[in-house]
Amino acid sequence: MAADNSKQFWKRSAKLPGSIQPVYGAQHPPLDPRLTKNFIKERSKVGTVPLKNKKASSFHEFARNTSDAWDIGDDEEEDFSSPSFQTLNSKVALATAAQVLENHSKLRVKPERSQSTTSDVPANYKVIKSSSDAQLSRNSSDTCLRNPLHKQQSLPLRPIIPLVARISDQNASGAPPMTVREKTRLEKFRQLLSSHNTDLDELRKCSWPGVPREVRPVTWRLLSGYLPANTERRKLTLQRKREEYFGFIEQYYDSRNEEHHQDTYRQIHIDIPRTNPLIPLFQQPLVQEIFERILFIWAIRHPASGYVQGINDLVTPFFVVFLSEYVEEDVENFDVTNLSQDMLRSIEADSFWCMSKLLDGIQDNYTFAQPGIQKKVKALEELVSRIDEQVHNHFRRYEVEYLQFAFRWMNNLLMRELPLRCTIRLWDTYQSEPEGFSHFHLYVCAAFLIKWRKEILDEEDFQGLLMLLQNLPTIHWGNEEIGLLLAEAYRLKYMFADAPNHYRR
């Protein structure tokens, strides 16, 4: 009994405020043991799979099988002798991955963009999680035609789909020269920011379609409410707030080793390496130490929620933007040890305060039972049922629950669905909108979902739909795609925000 308790100690904490909540993630699709057990029986019934197979793909089964979104192997040694490993059919795993790769290969942008502001990615380039995944991906092409995917087949424990690269902001020194329009916008920003009392309403209006990289750090500080509009007060405010943050470090950080804080710190320590694992910047020990301090201090100062998995992602846009204030070159590969101690302290403190301001507006997303997220997912379902009934009915037909894919969209603010450069552009608008991270985000999620309506309607089984929704091909997205997404979200908000009965049946 004691052994069982110790095994589950880190996986499910007590239901108290501040306890770690499970996070549904695309990197960890559900595995139903019953589906695996019945796989051999079902293979003999090819072509006779019913659209609704009792409870096999129901939400309750999904929730039970995804009570922990993180792989067990991420926290502790995997037991390869366990029944789940013994019953996993490798051919099924290969067939599943191959089917998804085949279905979505047509969505990948193959022509190279000659004047792109993003990092160039060869047409045949695929980011693979590990060398073993690469081998499985190569071998799967031969099995996809021989082993068609059925709803009753189980998914692999780990996805074999290439991970979506989280490429950093457009910081490369080789970026194309600014156009006349861009120069005019930059000058307008500089005039606003240098005025004695910055007109915040005008600044929000100018920032909605995107903030120039050169003035983004100070603009974000102002829009988040971290800096005052009065230019004479800014220097003293920054100095005071930065000293206050490092006062918290001196006061609280050593308590991470105390018994009542060990759970929180350990979970943070586990999650930090998972934050943007494909960007070298975030794998540097010094950067990970900065993130650990930021998250631990925030958790200590917000006991109602404490640290929840997913909050770690929200630090990264602020960190990259404030780092770009000191770095001209490509940020994602920059070695932060080249910066002075004062620069690093400024970046850390500013990231902490701006993240705190963001979370102040959405803290009910992270309190016990995460009621804010549940409410937003329900609102998304109601909204989609009105704006695209065909997509909504398609989900119902194949028993796909919105919580199965939209939980992460709300928990991580679409950060796991988009490249980091797109997240930064998205946040320009979120910080310009009233309640951008809470209210406007709902309409962005609705627009994002409908963007893929054709691909959604092409999928005709439960597993295919989930694999699509949890691995949407946005690797080549840039400012143009985000601009169109935001325009559609604004249209939906204009139509429905002031008339909630429009999306109530």
UniProtKB/Swiss-Prot annotation:
Positions of post-translational Phosphoserine modification: 58, 116, 154
PROSITE patterns given in the database record: TBC_RABGAP
Keywords on record: Acetylation, GTPase activation, Phosphoprotein
A GO molecular-function descriptor: GTPase activator activity
Disulfide bond positions: none
A Pfam family that the UniProt record links to this protein: RabGAP-TBC
Rab-GAP TBC domain residues: 210-434
Polar residues: compositionally biased ranges: 129-146
Domain of life: Eukaryota
Region: Disordered, residue numbers: 105-146
Coiled-coil ranges per UniProt: none
Modified residues (N-acetylalanine): 2
Subunit structure: Interacts with ACBD3 and ARFGEF1. Interacts with YWHAB, YWHAE, YWHAG, YWHAH, YWHAQ and YWHAZ.
Task performed by this protein: May act as a GTPase-activating protein for Rab family protein(s).
Protein name as catalogued: TBC1 domain family member 22B
High-level lineage: Eukaryota, Metazoa, Chordata, Craniata, Vertebrata
Gene: TBC1D22B
